[in-house]
Amino acid sequence: MTLEKNKDSFTNIIDLSLINKEQKVTFTPTKEIYTELLKKRLLTIALLVFIIKIGMAIPLPYIDQTKLLNNATSMFDLSGPGLAAVSARASQKIGLFTLGITPSINASIILQLAFVINPNLKKLQREEGESGRRKLIKYTRYLTLLLAITQSVFLIFSLRAFIFEWSILKLFELSCVLSSGAMIILWISECITKTGITNGSSFLIFLNIVSVLPEQIGMSFKNLDIFSFEGLIVILTFSITVWAAIFLQQTLYIIPLKNPKLGQNELTKKLVEDSLYLPFRLNQAGVMPVVFASYLIPILKTGGIYILLKINSFNLFPFLIKFPEVVNQSLESIVEAGLICLFALFYSGLIIDPKDVADELQKSGFFIFAIRPGEKTRNYLEKIFKELSLIGALILAFNVVLLNLVGFVFNLSIFKGFSIGSQIILLGVVTEILQKVQALVLNDVYKRIRDRNK
């Protein structure tokens, strides 16, 4: 994280209210505000989404889709915890794009974890600039292909009962088709990112959540009276978790910066100092802690059941295997909350290294008021960063536990598909799109004004 990147991401977003009266008169019509460049980018994204829909509608050959649909009440969770472009849960069909963005997401996670183990990768990410970034993209693509092939083989092998005349050759063919679909999704994701409107991977996850949300809401509230006590509890829970998602996503801790070389007079100095700050989010790790915990909980649960069955076979603690469901759910929620806190603290450390930030500040000639550059700055940033990460982790964990318990008590499936992670993704993507569109519009407005005044 460099100072310039930090500063640009927040100071370049200008509010439309800053346009003066003359500019508003000139560019009032809506058709003028939505510029040609913006229209092209939005149309590009719409076309790419249409391609995804077509790909999902193309069924895989050799598979008895009718038989598969009849046995799909407990469909394979192909996308992990909601991380696919459009999952099989939404389409109820095994199609070309069934794997979605999952292999790419998993590849990115694995590479980020590898940065901790391999210092050369960390150096490649931080010090080699554009060439290093291109190498990392290439590594991500290779790893995505490897994961897509692996996931395809396991998926097709698990569906062998629904495949006409099962053979190893058909396993190879279908795996190639699914892997190709995953790589096409990766290409679409990169194309969406290049439009500058939003991050491609996040947008595809956003599409997945939105595609299944209406059905989940309808099923969950079908037998629930929203004016009853249970309905009020559900509405209150939604309000709390949505507020928490907004708070985690939008709250910034601002550290003002000083630079003695900038600003020669009082007015210039004041303007410069007001625009210099180091922003830290409460939730630097985003939804990754929830994703990690979602992957790990089923493994721990399966292992725990196996151990309990082994213990029960010796009749040592027979009461353990007869725990009521509410106790099991409570223990699972507590373990998940603990894992989320651990992963949030760990993953936040991967995203921002206070030592690197302190070094970058010192090289750029910036310092924090009343804090000496170097070691003192690093210690101060570490302290602030740990406190913010802990607060964000606790809020994240509390909301996950709250949604799990309320969903379990009132038997609401919507809380599984509309978790705090989903809310953060939805809010983050919508906010990013609005900010990027606003910035593009203002950039074009000021460009026209500048050209007109020449």
UniProtKB/Swiss-Prot annotation:
User: Domain of life here?
Assistant: Eukaryota
Any GO CC annotation of this UniProt entry: chloroplast thylakoid membrane
Which UniProt keywords are given for this protein, alphabetically ordered? Chloroplast, Membrane, Plastid, Protein transport, Thylakoid, Translocation, Transmembrane, Transmembrane helix, Transport
Query: Which InterPro entries does this chain map to?
Result: SecY, SecY/SEC61-alpha, SecY_dom_sf
Q: Name one GO biological process term.
A: intracellular protein transmembrane transport
Q: Where in the cell is it found?
A: Plastid, Chloroplast thylakoid membrane
Pfam families assigned to the protein according to its UniProt record, in alphabetical order: SecY (PF00344)
Coiled-coil residue windows: none
| Positions of transmembrane segments | 43-63, 97-117, 144-164, 168-188, 201-221, 226-246, 289-309, 334-354, 390-410, 414-434
The record's listing under Gene3D superfamilies reads: SecY subunit domain
Function of the molecule: The central subunit of the protein translocation channel SecYE. Consists of two halves formed by TMs 1-5 and 6-10. These two domains form a lateral gate at the front which open onto the bilayer between TMs 2 and 7, and are clamped together by SecE at the back. The channel is closed by both a pore ring composed of hydrophobic SecY resides and a short helix (helix 2A) on the extracellular side of the membrane which forms a plug.
Subunit annotation: Component of the plastid Sec protein translocase complex, which is composed of at least SecY and SecE.
Q: Which family does it belong to?
A: Belongs to the SecY/SEC61-alpha family.
What HAMAP family would the database entry show?
A: SecY (MF_01465)
Descriptive protein name = Protein translocase subunit SecY
